[in-house]
Amino acid sequence: MAAAAPASAGTKGVVRQVIGPVLDVEFPAGKLPKILNALRIEGTNTAGQPVALTAEVQQLLGDHRVRAVAMSGTDGLVRGMEALDTGAPISVPVGEATLGRIFNVLGEPVDEQGPVNASATAPIHRSAPKLTELETKPKVFETGIKVIDLLAPYRQGGKVGLFGGAGVGKTVLIQELINNIAKEHGGVSVFGGVGERTREGNDLYEEFKDSGVINAEDLSKSKVALCYGQMNEPPGARMRVGLSALTMAEHFRDVNKQDVLLFVDNIFRFVQAGSEVSALLGRMPSAVGYQPTLGTDVGELQERITSTLEGSITSIQAVYVPADDLTDPAPATTFAHLDATTVLSRGLASKGIYPAVDPLDSTSTMLQPAVVGEEHYKTARAVQSTLQRYKELQDIIAILGLDELSEDDRRTVDRARKIEKFLSQPFFVAEIFTGMPGVYVKLEETIAGFNQILAGELDHLPEQAFYLVGNIDQVKAKAEKIAAEAK
């Protein structure tokens, strides 16, 4: 039996006021739309040009009026235009049909590849999974990337903050993670572009096609769906596009029972968009001008990203830190939700060590003996203490030279340099421009390899043999090749 249509569906109202992206609409008495319902406004402006936009109801004002936020530009909108209550929240297409496609906040394809033949749509607003549905046992999410798996392991169904400036390899790291989850875990990914540059969104799409993550010939074989609300969009779109991407990811988790990767770039822009419309909605600004509902807004998004008994959504969120101030309310609120942080270092990138993940600054709540095991924990801490000692000695080396160090310190420096090189690895998605085949390294191989370096079993091998390889067997093979070439 078909469900009854909502009582307010199809009710027509009239636009009474427009202030930037915020508009007031008057409806007949007793037929007001519900909060978060989508309103559809279509008509022609004074110049005879067509105007069509969707707005989301945010407040009921009294006097039969509602206040709504537009999801696209309000140019040409005039008072007296008709607004139709759709009777439901904004809904987006979900399922396999979304793979390989680019959507806007309303779930409309924007890649000129024709309509999307999705068998289902889902509303972008829903409650987080119940406590009884959650997977409570912490489980490490293996990425196949040595530096992450060893020193800052990701939690399955957890949230990771990705910190890094321009040109240090954020995009390549994201692509590799998408590639690895598809090949090793049979999972798919959803990318939410929130308030970042349109050029970057286009570049990412082209790079996904080049690396095979999006199969241009057969879109059904693609491994990622893209949802963009870039920085030229009104704040309404930037405020909701993260939820549109999350809704697509939730379908893969709950219906297809898959492990999903959700990328959000950039989570700060989601907060920023909320603060832009908050004052227009008549709310009193809070600390540093942010919306008073900051904690709730972030919490509603983050609490839906989790592991259930059916599947998981593991989220990697790029975090922009305004003026490098970690105490700013936006990043500070985000940090409370993160299980791990992956910090990309310009210093490592300039040395040619990729992925340029900083082994000392990156952290994870999973790195504890009860979760990862005693051997993994001890190896990770020994690697970090060796690298920390090397960092402390660098000033002495720069002034006095390596020869002035004690025998022990020289050995530490030698091993630390090998560890630093061994933390690099060739990526599958970078094969096209490095010419080196990518490597997925199992966690056991990673731990065994670093243990051998720390124990001094590989002190006789040249440092260069550890650079851009997978496991220790490849190190030994590379060392033999270097020795043969030197003869």
Curated annotation (Swiss-Prot):
Q: Does the keyword Chloroplast apply?
A: no
Q: From the UniProt record, which GO molecular function terms apply?
A: ATP binding; ATP hydrolysis activity; proton-transporting ATP synthase activity, rotational mechanism
- Keyword terms of this UniProt record: ATP synthesis, ATP-binding, CF(1), Hydrogen ion transport, Ion transport, Membrane, Nucleotide-binding, Thylakoid, Translocase, Transport
Q: What is this protein called?
A: ATP synthase subunit beta
| Pfam families in the cross-refs | ATP-synt_ab, ATP-synt_ab_N, ATP-synt_VA_C
At which positions is ATP bound?
A: 164-171
GO CC annotations on file? plasma membrane-derived thylakoid membrane; proton-transporting ATP synthase complex
Q: How does it sit in the membrane?
A: Peripheral membrane protein
Q: Which gene encodes it?
A: atpD
Its assembly, as annotated, is: F-type ATPases have 2 components, CF(1) - the catalytic core - and CF(0) - the membrane proton channel. CF(1) has five subunits: alpha(3), beta(3), gamma(1), delta(1), epsilon(1). CF(0) has four main subunits: a(1), b(1), b'(1) and c(9-12).
Q: Please name the source species.
A: Synechococcus sp. (strain WH7803)
Note the SS bond partners. none
E.C. number: 7.1.2.2
Enzyme class, one word?
Answer: translocase
Q: What does this protein do?
A: Produces ATP from ADP in the presence of a proton gradient across the membrane. The catalytic sites are hosted primarily by the beta subunits.
Broad class of the protein's primary localization: membrane
NCBIfam families from the entry?
A: atpD
Recorded catalytic reaction(s): these are:
ATP + H2O + 4 H(+)(in) = ADP + phosphate + 5 H(+)(out)
Query: Where is the protein localized?
Result: Cellular thylakoid membrane
Q: Which family does it belong to?
A: Belongs to the ATPase alpha/beta chains family.
